[in-house]
UniProtKB/Swiss-Prot annotation:
It comes from the Eukaryota. It is found in: Secreted. Belongs to the serpin family. This is Angiotensinogen. GO terms for cellular component: extracellular region. In response to lowered blood pressure, the enzyme renin cleaves angiotensin-1, from angiotensinogen. ACE (angiotensin converting enzyme) then removes a dipeptide to yield the physiologically active peptide angiotensin-2, the most potent pressor substance known, which helps regulate volume and mineral balance of body fluids. GO terms for biological process: vasoconstriction. It comes from Gallus gallus (Chicken). Keywords: Secreted, Vasoactive, Vasoconstrictor. The keyword Secreted applies. Its main location: secreted.
Length: 10
């Protein structure tokens, strides 16, 4: 699981 997910996809 991701600890932090970016609000936007790179």
């Amino acid at each position: 699981d991701r600890v932090y997910v970016h609000p936007f996809s790179l």
